[in-house]
Amino acid sequence: MRPLIAFGFIVLLASAGVAAPPAYLLISESELAEARRKADEHPRARQVLDDLLERAEEALGRPVELPARGGQWPHWYSCKRDGARLKTISPTEHRCPVCGTVYRGEPYDSVPLYHQHGQYSRAVRDLGLAYRLTGRAELARRAKEILLGYAARYRNYPLHDRFGEAKTGGGHVMAQTLDESVWLIPVVWGYSLVRETLSEEERRRVEEGLLRPAAGVIREHKLGIHNIQCWKNSAVGLVGFAVGDEELIREAIDDPQRGFRAQMARGVTSDGLWFEGSLGYHHYTMSALWPLAEAARLAEIDLYSDRYRALFDAPISLALPNGDSPGFNDNAGGNLSGYAPLYELAYARWGESRHGKVAAGGSRNSLEALLYGAARLPEGSVAPEASILLRDAGYAALRSPLVTAAVRFGMHGGGHGHPDKLNVVTYGAGRLAGLDPGSINYGVPLHQEWYKSTIAHNTVSVDGQIQKNEDGQLEEWRSEGGVTKFTGVADRVYDGVVLRRTLELDGAELRDRFECSSDGEHTYDWAFHAPGRISSSLALEAVAVPL
C-alpha cells in the first residue's frame, strides 16, 4: 500500500477504533494495480480504461472556465405543453423540439449550468483516476486547477433553491442539497486521488474553501429516512474521511435519525425494498450508498450488512421476465441490466452468483467494472421463476411460465408514491400487456395532472377522484401446485368504500376479480392501460378538458 506522504496523518474514530482510509478514499493501491492488470488482459477492461483516458484528455484539452453562477433544477427543463425535454439553442434560448415553444429567463437559463458543473465534477474524478492509473502529472495539474477554481468561487456563488430563493435546502453550485451532494462526491474523490500533488497551502484552500463549506451547506438541511439523505450522508462522510474530521464521519454513519445505519434499519423493508416503493428510487438510493460504504470499508468500518445486501436482492425478486422493473411510483426503474455497475461492486463484496449474473448482463463498460469488477463473472439468467410476496413492502409478483402479474397493495411510498392501490402490471407473450404510466420531469404540470392520478393506473377510481395516500393490506396469499392466488384490500383510500382485488394465476390464465363495496352509491371506473393504437371509423375531434 502506498504510504501517505504529502497528507500523512491518522485519525482514530472513537466509535469504531479504526484508522482513516488510504489516501485514495474509494479505492486502494492494490485495486488500482488490479485495474491495470485487467486492462492489460481483458479487451472490455481495456476499452473502459481507454474511454476514461479519452475523457481525461478532453478535460485536459479544454480551458477551465467555471460557470459564473450555480445551476438550476433539471426537472424545470421540459415543455409545459407536452413534457418534451428542451433543447438549448443559446444561453438564453431553450426550445421544445416537439411544438417549437421557446422558453427564456429563469429557471431555464441556469439549467444548462447544472450540466456544466456536473461535467467539471466528473472531470476531477476522471483526471484523478487517470493520473493514478498512468502517472501523468499533467492530469493531476488540471484536476488541481479545477479544484482551486471552485475553492475560490464556491462561497461566492449565491445560495439558491429550486425557486431561486436563498433558503436552507438550496446549494451554491446546485439548486438543492441533493444535487450539491451528487456533485460533491466525485469532486472529493478526485481530490483524494491528486491530493499529494498539491502543496500544503493548496490543500488548505481546497479543504477550507470548498470541501468543508460544501459539507456545511449539505449538513444544514436535515432530512430523515430518505434517498436524498443517503446522498447527503455519502457526501458529508467522504469529506470527513478526506479531511480527517471524525465528527463528519460519525454523523454520516451513526446519526440515529439519518445516518447510514439508520437508513438501513428504517428505510429498507424486511423484504429488501427501499420504502419509497419505486424501483428507480431504489436503485438511486443504492447509487447513493456505495461511496460511503466503500470509504468506510477501507477504514475498516463494515457497512456491508445483511440489510444492505437485501437492497441488491429485492430488484431481482420483482423483475419481469425481460429484466424490466414493474413501473410503480415515480421513476419507474428500467431494466436490471442498466444497474449492472452496482452489481459489479455487490459481487466483489459478497460473491453471490445472482449479483454476478446481473453484472454480466450489462455491457461491463463502467468504471465500477474496471475498478472493482471480477475478471470473470458467472453466466446465466437471473429471471425469477417462482411467485413471490414482499409482505412488508406491499408488493407481489404472481408467476407462471407464460405470464407474470405484479401488484402493488401496501405502503404508499412517501412523496414519490402514486395513488394506485391494487394497481397491476402484467407481462406475457414476450411483452408488457398492462402498463403503469411511471413519471415525467416533475416540473411539468402533466406529472401531477395525469401521471399521479388514479385513473392513469390499472386500478379502480371512485367518483372520478384520486385515491388518498393511504396504505393497503394483504388479505390472502397462496402459491402451490402451479397456481398462485392473491387478495389485497384498500379500505382507506376512499371514504366509506372498500376496494378488494383478487388475482389468480394458473398457467396462461390470469383471473382478475375487483370488488367495490359501500353503503352509498358511487361511480366506479376500472381502468386497464395496454399498449396499442386507437383506430375508429368515426371522425375524432380533439377536446381540451381536464384529465
Residue ranges of predicted features:
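Positively charged n-region of N-terminal signal peptides that target proteins for export
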Residues: M1-L4
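Carbohydrate-active enzyme catalytic cores, enriched for enzymes
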Residues: K232, G237-V243, G280-A433
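Inter-helical turn/loop segments and adjacent helix faces that build the functional surface
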Residues: T134, V194-R205, V243-E247, A295-Y304
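Catalytic and substrate-binding regions of extracellular carbohydrate-active enzymes
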Residues: A359-L547
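Secondary-structure capping and boundary motifs in well-ordered enzyme cores
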Residues: Q119, Q176-E180, I228, P256, ...
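Bacterial N-terminal signal peptides
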Residues: A6-S15
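Extracellular glycan-targeting catalytic surfaces
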Residues: V18-G224, C230-G237, I253, Q257, ...
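Long, repeat-rich segments with strong aromatic
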Residues: V243, E247, I253-A299, A396, ...
